C-alpha cells in the first residue's frame, strides 16, 4: 500500500505545509509505514492537485498497487484529488481539512476528527456516489442561483484594498440581494418538466455547502439519489426570515419540507436534473463543488458508488 499526501500550501489563512509535513512523517512512523511507501507533494498552481493525483494513480496502476491519497486543503483541493483518482479502483482519497472551507466532511464528522492524521492512516474506505455535470464531477453539492451568485462575486470584492474574506462575502451578499434575485427556470427532474421563478436550486449529494449551509440534512452519499431543493421567488423580507432556517437545515425533516415552508421550498429526490433559464439568451451562475461561473444550464446526474473515500478510523467505526 502506498500513502500519498498532496498539500495545497495556499489553502486557508496560512501555509499549512510547515505544520503538516513533519506531522505526517511522525504519524506514518507511528503507524509503521515505511519511508519508501510515503510520498508528500505540495501544489504550486491551480489544478495542480488534480494533475498530481493522476500521476500518483498512474504510477500505482503500473504496479497494480493500492494507493491512499490524502488531500490537505479545502473542498476545492479535495475535489481535484478525488476526480483525479476516481477512475482507479485501487485508489481511495482522504481529506485533511486545512482550507478556508471544508463543508464536505461535515456529512460524516468533525474537523477535529479529520485532522487526526494517525486516525486517517488507520481509517476505513467507504464507497460514495458522485455527481456528473457538464462542468465536471462533484462529490458534495451543485447549485444555480442566489448562492452561486454570492460565491462568484466574492473575488471581485477581495481585490478591494483591506477587504478580507469575511467582508468580501458580506458585500457580495448585499450586491446579490439588491439585484435581480430570481430567475425563471425550466427544470427537468427525471423527465418531469416544469417551470419555476426560483432564487436557487441546490442539487445535493452531501449535506453542507457554502460555509455551513445545511441544504440537505438527510442526504446520504451512498444511496444513489440526489436531494434537490428548489427555493421559489420570495420578497427580500421573507428571504431574511427563510435564509437562517435554510442555513440551519430546519426547512426539511422526516423526508419532507416542513409545513410552514412548503409553499416556498420544494423537495425532489432525483437521479438526474437539468436546469436552464426559460429565456435562452440568459445565463445562470452555476456552482459545482465551490467552483462558480456563468453557464447556459446546470445538468447533473448521480453516478452511484463511483469514488472511494477514506474516513478516519473513529468516524468509519461509527458509520459501520
Predicted regions and their residues:
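Short Gly/Thr/Asp-enriched flexible loops that form oxyanion-binding sites at enzyme active sites
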Residues: 77-89
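Gly/Ser/Thr-rich active-site loops/lids in small-molecule metabolic enzymes
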Residues: 158-168, 212, 217-240
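Glycine-rich beta-strand-to-loop/alpha-helix junction loops that act as flexible
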Residues: 9, 72-74, 98
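Short hydrophobic segments within beta-strands
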Residues: 6-8, 96, 231
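Glycine-rich phosphate/pyrophosphate-binding beta-alpha loops
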Residues: 143, 147, 202-216, 292
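ATP/NTP phosphate-donor binding region
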Residues: 1-69, 115, 316, 320
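Catalytic core of DAGKc-family lipid kinases
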Residues: 43, 87-199
Amino acid at each position: 500500500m502506498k500513502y500519498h499526501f498532496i498539500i495545497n500550501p495556499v489553502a486557508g489563512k496560512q501555509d499549512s505545509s510547515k505544520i503538516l509535513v513533519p506531522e505526517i512523517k511522525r504519524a506514518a512512523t507511528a503507524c509503521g509505514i515505511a519511508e519508501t511507501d510515503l510520498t508528500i507533494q505540495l501544489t504550486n498552481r491551480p489544478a495542480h492537485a488534480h494533475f498530481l493525483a493522476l500521476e500518483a494513480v498512474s504510477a500505482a496502476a503500473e504496479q497494480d498497487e493500492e494507493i491512499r491519497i490524502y488531500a490537505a486543503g479545502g473542498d476545492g483541493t479535495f475535489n481535484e484529488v478525488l476526480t483525479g483518482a476516481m477512475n482507479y479502483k485501487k485508489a481511495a482519497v482522504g481529506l485533511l481539512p486545512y482550507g478556508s472551507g471544508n463543508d464536505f466532511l461535515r456529512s460524516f464528522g468533525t474537523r477535529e476528527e479529520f485532522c487526526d492524521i494517525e486516525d486517517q492512516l488507520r481509517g476505513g474506505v467507504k464507497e460514495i456516489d458522485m455527481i456528473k455535470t457538464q462542468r465536471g464531477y462533484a462529490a458534495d453539492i451543485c447549485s444555480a442561483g442566489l448562492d452561486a451568485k454570492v460565491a462568484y462575486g466574492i473575488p471581485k470584492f477581495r481585490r478591494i484594498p483591506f477587504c478580507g474574506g469575511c467582508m468580501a462575502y458580506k458585500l457580495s451578499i448585499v450586491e446579490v440581494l439588491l439585484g435581480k434575485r430570481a430567475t425563471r427556470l425550466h427544470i427537468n427532474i427525471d423527465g418531469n418538466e416544469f417551470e419555476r421563478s426560483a432564487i436557487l436550486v441546490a442539487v445535493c449529494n452531501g449535506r453542507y455547502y457554502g460555509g455551513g449551509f445545511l441544504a440537505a440534512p438527510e442526504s446520504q452519499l451512498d444511496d444513489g439519489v440526489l436531494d434537490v431543493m428548489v427555493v421559489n421567488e420570495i420578497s427580500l423580507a421573507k428571504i431574511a426570515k427563510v435564509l437562517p432556517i435554510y442555513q440551519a437545515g430546519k426547512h426539511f425533516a422526516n423526508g419532507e419540507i416542513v409545513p410552514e415552508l412548503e409553499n416556498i421550498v420544494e423537495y425532489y429526490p432525483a437521479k438526474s436534473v437539468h436546469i436552464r433559464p426559460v429565456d435562452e439568451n440568459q445565463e445562470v451562475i452555476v456552482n459545482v463543488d465551490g467552483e462558480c461561473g456563468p453557464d447556459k444550464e446546470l445538468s447533473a446526474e448521480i453516478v452511484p458508488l463511483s469514488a472511494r473515500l477514506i474516513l478516519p478510523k473513529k468516524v468509519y467505526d461509527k458509520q459501520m
